[in-house]
Amino acid sequence: MTKVEYKHTEIAVKKQLGQNFLTDRNITRKIVRLSGAKPEENILEIGPGFGALTKEIIEVCPSFTVVEKDPKLAAFIRTEYPQLNVIEADFLKIDLEAVTGARKLRILGNIPYSITSPILFRLLEYRRCFMHATLMMQHEVAMRIVAVPSTKEYGILAVQLQAFFDVSYGFRVGRKVFKPQPGVDSAVITITPKEHVPLSDPEGFSRFVRCAFHQRRKTLLNNLKESYNLDAVPSEVLKRRAEALAIQELFELFKEMKPKMLS
């Protein structure tokens, strides 16, 4: 069992929580600069751990909210930074609307590898609650988020997020700046909810994307024919694969889709 100790607080690292603690202050400063955080803003940090990033955010914004699932780490943050609002809970289960209040959130976090995708889809669900997020995650996942069409990384994650967010790759973070050291590098990305998305049915679009990419080597015709009436779609379009279509092309294709009624 790996144990990490900081300021007389020792915890057994929980692999199921994906706990890897950042140790390089140059990286945390860079994350806060990239976030654009300002003193008057409503800031939320996901998973502060031992407060490496927290310490730098405080330099900009003396009081803000953190969400920490681990009881021992939540207690540590309360003691170390009594001015902060500590929510001891699973980020995937909290009501972000209640946390937001009257002001949209600016979110920062070194998010656990094990729940990166669930956190991203949670942010997608609550996209009206925040103005910007700066997140560190596994490098491979970051590359999938910012991927472009006709690349192996381009898939459901890229399309779902890029449809509703402006996404940007910040910088790579080597594995040696974490304790315990993970087996892969990390990266920092930013996501900003788009002001306007040309979709009247976002949930329907999400279902369509999952169908279109269900088997990525198959054509749109083969992936969609069981779930949608394709009569209005040109045959040359149906011969293509979903991975070759840009976001706007997928928007336009979705508008032509008519879901089949279940018998």
Curated annotation (Swiss-Prot):
Binding residue positions for S-adenosyl-L-methionine: N20, L22, G47, E68, D90, N110
Reaction(s) catalysed (UniProt annotation): adenosine(1518)/adenosine(1519) in 16S rRNA + 4 S-adenosyl-L-methionine = N(6)-dimethyladenosine(1518)/N(6)-dimethyladenosine(1519) in 16S rRNA + 4 S-adenosyl-L-homocysteine + 4 H(+)
SMART domains assigned to the protein according to its UniProt record, in alphabetical order: rADc
EC number(s) from the headed UniProt entry: 2.1.1.182
Keyword set, alphabetical order: Cytoplasm, Methyltransferase, RNA-binding, rRNA processing, S-adenosyl-L-methionine, Transferase
Localization, UniProt: Cytoplasm
Disulfide bonds listed in the record: none
Enzyme class name: transferase
Highest taxon above the source species: Bacteria
Cellular component terms per the entry's GO annotation: cytosol
Gene Ontology terms, MF aspect: 16S rRNA (adenine(1518)-N(6)/adenine(1519)-N(6))-dimethyltransferase activity; RNA binding
Primary localization class, coarse: cytoplasm
InterPro entries named among the record's database cross-references: KsgA/Erm, rRNA_Ade_diMease-like_C, rRNA_Ade_Mease_Trfase_CS, rRNA_Ade_methylase_Trfase_N, rRNA_adenine_dimethylase, SAM-dependent_MTases_sf
Xref: PANTHER family: DIMETHYLADENOSINE TRANSFERASE, DIMETHYLADENOSINE TRANSFERASE-RELATED
Family: Belongs to the class I-like SAM-binding methyltransferase superfamily. rRNA adenine N(6)-methyltransferase family. RsmA subfamily.
Free-text function comment from the UniProt entry: Specifically dimethylates two adjacent adenosines (A1518 and A1519) in the loop of a conserved hairpin near the 3'-end of 16S rRNA in the 30S particle. May play a critical role in biogenesis of 30S subunits.
Protein known as: Ribosomal RNA small subunit methyltransferase A
